[in-house]
Regions:
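An acidic site on a long C-lobe helix of protein kinase domains
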Residues: 1-2, 28, 82-83
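Amphipathic terminal alpha-helices
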Residues: 83-96
Length: 96
């Protein structure tokens, strides 16, 4: 998805600036892992949630860090797919 946006920016003409990009929707790492298990049909192991304070990190992490994609969407007039849709397409391609 990011490669498509970069191609679009190059094709339409790059407008200088800082752009944020991620697929639509929000999820935690736990939600992401559960979706991978569900989409890939993995049943051999369990995904368990882990609170941020249980996972040591060298840098402090924000509690909520969703990116605002308004600028990239309006500048290049693009539709961004939902992360689960893109994840499903990726897993299907990997399994092909």
């Amino acid at each position: 998805d990011l490669a498509r946006v970069i191609f679009t920016a190059i094709y339409k003409g790059v407008v200088p600036g800082v752009y944020h990009f991620s697929d639509e929707g929000v999820c935690s790492w736990y939600d992401f892992a559960k979706a991978i298990h569900r989409i890939a049909g993995i049943t051999t192991c369990k995904v368990s949630p882990l609170h941020t304070n249980e996972y040591p990190a060298k840098a402090p992490r924000p509690h909520y860090s969703v990116l605002d994609k308004t600028k990239v969407k309006t500048t290049y007039n693009i539709e961004i797919p939902h992360w689960e849709e893109s994840l499903e397409a990726c897993i299907k391609e990997l399994n092909a």
